[in-house]
Amino acid sequence: MARFFQPKKHSTLDTKHQPVTIERLDHQGSGLAFLHKKPLFVDGALPGEEVLIQLTENKSKYARGQLIKVLKPSAERVAPFCAHYAQCGGCDLQHLDRAGQIHHKQQALSQLMVKFAGQSLALSAPVCSDDQGYRRRARLSLMWDKKTQQLQLGFRRKQSKAIVNVTDCPVLEPSLNALLPDLNALLSEWSQPERLGHVELVKGDNTRVLVLRHLGALIEQDQQRLTDFASQNQLTLYLMLEAGELQHVQGEAPYCEETGSRLSFLPSHFIQVNRAVNQHMVAQALNWLEVSPQEHVLDLFCGLGNFTLPLAKQAQAVVGVEGVDEMVQHATHNAKLNQINNVAFYQANLEQDMTSASWAQQKFAKVLLDPARAGAEGIVDQLSALGAKRVVYVSCNPATLARDSQSLLSQGFRLEKLGMLDMFPHTSHLESMALFVKKG
């Protein structure tokens, strides 16, 4: 039978402006409406608002629309405090007041736990901080625009790879924010601007850190101007080479004083962005674990010892386990720095079976987990075998927390407490803490 060519059908996008009513926010902070019974996502729209939209995407199961005009605003709508908010992709909830942001994040956490773990629980009080000047580290992109012959220093534009030039970031720690105009001016006069990669700014308790990612060797003139800038501003300066290695140029090694312990770190190490929330988070985790002086505690995904060292002040002994060997070495250094002798750190791939590891033979009634966004798949299935009776799970991804909760519930744990940690105000990103207790 002959087969004839048939052109593919192309669905035309209706670009007329259309009014819709926003029902709620989705977990990413976009307004959710329904257009012909199909979910429609609208960035910048709030629950209860009547808005005018233009379709930008129309799939079989969902659609996306651009907010054209707010016809009937929500009482929770506020004017963004940042001049770059409309373009910058760093924040996505500045148009929603703080109470509304916190309510939305708590609601999102509750809904995910009900949907994927079948757990409904009244949330503990949220852990919050000041909503401006809270970021103690940031990575800013650098791009040389050949057409305009100008350097762009800032953050990615919303849903784009383009750079929004930023000279003021109100959520950045004030002493870091103050560097932006002069840093932009310095790098705009760079001899080879096309070789600039990115800049990282970090606020330690003893110093501010500047890291410059540069492709290829610096010429002497640029190197001198950079070191002069660091000296004038009393900065610790690092260069990041093409292989990703850090080269310390000048200044003190940075550290943070966290919950009574001094944590030395390198700019490549993970530290929590929001110092105030981190301190409250650590205190709450210790309170929920209820550690006694006779107990051995296990800290999984321990990093530099953010939880490990405070735990060691309450327990008989603490074991910290981390996947990155360099972090293990630095955590061990931090324990010595703080004269804490009842901790031991180990490197291990926590996706594998750990029950036969030497450190696992101690058995631990109390366990703390603080995994990355991928969650604790692998090790979470082994907690009952490790002797756990009480588990605090700190999560930066509620979806993987909900998934891992299913494993804990199947091992005979019950979810006793659940709370939201507002580590990143004015963004839809939420962190959370859950307490699981072994039944019986």
Curated annotation (Swiss-Prot):
InterPro entries associated with the record: 23S_rRNA_MeTrfase_RlmD, MeTrfase_TrmA_AS, MeTrfase_TrmA_CS, NA-bd_OB-fold, SAM-dependent_MTases_sf, TRAM_dom, U5_MeTrfase_fam
UniProt organism field: Vibrio cholerae serotype O1 (strain ATCC 39541 / Classical Ogawa 395 / O395)
Enzyme Commission number, as recorded: 2.1.1.190
Function, in words: Catalyzes the formation of 5-methyl-uridine at position 1939 (m5U1939) in 23S rRNA.
Keywords: 4Fe-4S, Iron, Iron-sulfur, Metal-binding, Methyltransferase, rRNA processing, S-adenosyl-L-methionine, Transferase
Keyword Iron-sulfur part of the UniProt annotation: yes
Positions with a binding annotation for [4Fe-4S] cluster: C82, C88, C91, C169
Active site: C396 (nucleophile)
One Pfam assignment: tRNA_U5-meth_tr
Gene3D superfamilies, per the entry: 2.40.50.1070, Nucleic acid-binding proteins, Vaccinia Virus protein VP39
GO molecular function terms listed in the Swiss-Prot or TrEMBL record: 4 iron, 4 sulfur cluster binding; iron ion binding; RNA binding; rRNA (uridine-C5-)-methyltransferase activity
Domain TRAM as annotated: residue spans: 11-69
UniProt-recorded name of the protein: 23S rRNA (uracil(1939)-C(5))-methyltransferase RlmD
Gene: rlmD
Keyword Transmembrane helix: no
Coiled coil: none
Catalyses which reaction(s): uridine(1939) in 23S rRNA + S-adenosyl-L-methionine = 5-methyluridine(1939) in 23S rRNA + S-adenosyl-L-homocysteine + H(+)
Gene Ontology biological process terms from the UniProt entry: rRNA base methylation
Family classification: Belongs to the class I-like SAM-binding methyltransferase superfamily. RNA M5U methyltransferase family. RlmD subfamily.
Residues holding S-adenosyl-L-methionine: Q272, F301, N306, E322, N349, D370
